[in-house]
């Protein structure tokens, strides 16, 4: 009977073989997984008011408030600009507080009261800020204007409530409206056409009329 040599197994060989087995097993598992179509998440019911009217929606949980307003309620006055919360074109009011609707999920607003540019005024009865923007030519292309006006409305309410800002002379006192205050408080709203001076003039006019 011939002598058959004992197999010699090195530590390096064992490790290499184990690694190869893991790769093969993983590739087979990935192949099986990739064959399965991804299921869409089940829609979730959410109810909130928009411009005084209650809406009941069934939405994908990933739907932003901005997309709910534009794509589901067809309120296209609120604009999608950067979609990253950097330009302010999508600004709306939620319970009176301004937010970037592109950064907020619609399902977070169960029971909330949302106000868009359509809810501030109408062509026949414009909001004072809307009328002032027209008088002072506070826009050029107009794309950012709905967000600018919603933000300005909330900003004037913040000053009336005594909220100070980074540029306020006395953070413990009552803020005084100035051009510097307006520019600071409106800094989250970008106007790519550069109509900032006219925007400030429009807001100042309304603030003085309300004083």
Predicted regions and their residues:
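Signature of N-terminal electron-transfer/Fe-S-associated modules in redox systems
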Residues: 2-211
